[in-house]
């Protein structure tokens, strides 16, 4: 099989590494890279709350949240979702030279578990 790559109009690859279609197919259903850890700090949660105007107490009030059902403040689901570019650009498969990246869309996104302030996440 031939090699496949995504190129811009000028012929420059949009992604840093080329994978043959055979190698890419072999990775279906398997882990294709692990990102660097990302610290989910209260400061980051507060900044996200300010930008999005979502200042629910479960996100921004550590004292009240400590008494609540989750035992402390938790990150917004959309804060975690917004880290997808970070995860992509810091793993061994997608890291490298990108000319640009564009979000195409999402399907069936769910937030099954809360992420407490002070946690670390990665893909």
Where are these regions (language model features)?
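Catalytic strand-loop segment that frames the active site of acyl-thioester-processing enzymes
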Residues: 4-75, 89
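Hydrophobic beta-strand-centered segment that forms part of the acyl-chain substrate-binding groove
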Residues: 69-72, 82-123
């Amino acid at each position: 099989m031939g090699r496949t790559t995504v190129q811009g109009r000028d012929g420059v690859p949009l992604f840093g590494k080329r994978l043959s279609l055979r190698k890419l197919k072999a990775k279906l259903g398997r882990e294709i890279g692990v990102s660097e850890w990302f610290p989910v700090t209260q400061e980051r949660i507060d900044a996200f709350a300010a930008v999005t105007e979502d200042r629910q107490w479960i996100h921004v009030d550590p004292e009240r949240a400590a008494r609540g059902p989750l035992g402390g403040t938790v990150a917004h689901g959309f804060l975690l979702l917004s880290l997808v570019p970070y995860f992509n650009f810091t793993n061994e498969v997608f890291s490298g030279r990108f000319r640009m990246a564009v979000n195409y869309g999402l399907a069936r996104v769910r937030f099954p578990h809360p992420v407490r302030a002070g946690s670390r996440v990665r893909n």
